[in-house]
């Protein structure tokens, strides 16, 4: 018996397989956490959102405003503890997943599009959704299209359970 009937992964991954790449990612995330503590949340968020993958987000976005209220210590701690570099890869277990999985990514986020394709191809009931003209934060950059794709997936998954 499964605890869930379906799963949606938005710009998700099953981990970094290469141990040296995991170690490098953990070190990079630790350095970024220290930078957040040094420059503060507002400066960090503004610099982070200046990246091309987030170009559609601006100060008017309520999620951006919410992020600006975070504590530097909390963001840094989360980054250190939840770094992909500290997570064991789970690619081998994906073939054992028994529920439908939607792997969703923004089309401009080439890295996570490739990961989403691999996840959807590996999970027996995997489905791929690529949101056009969108970067890494599909729910923030293209909320209507993202919600529509997720709603369709849930409806299809629910119909298959009946």
Model-derived features with residue positions:
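Catalytic histidine-centered segment of alpha/beta-hydrolase-like enzymes
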Residues: 134-143, 147
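Catalytic histidine neighborhood in serine/cysteine hydrolases
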Residues: 120-137
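Flexible "cap/lid" loop of the alpha/beta hydrolase fold
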Residues: 3-36
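Hydrophobic, aromatic-rich cap/lid helix
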Residues: 63-92
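C-terminal alpha-helix
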Residues: 149-160
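Gly/Thr-rich phosphate-binding loop signature of adenosyl cofactor/nucleotide-binding cores
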Residues: 48
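Short beta-strand/loop motif that positions the catalytic acidic residue
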Residues: 97, 103-105
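Conserved alpha/beta-hydrolase "acid-adjacent" motif
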Residues: 110-115
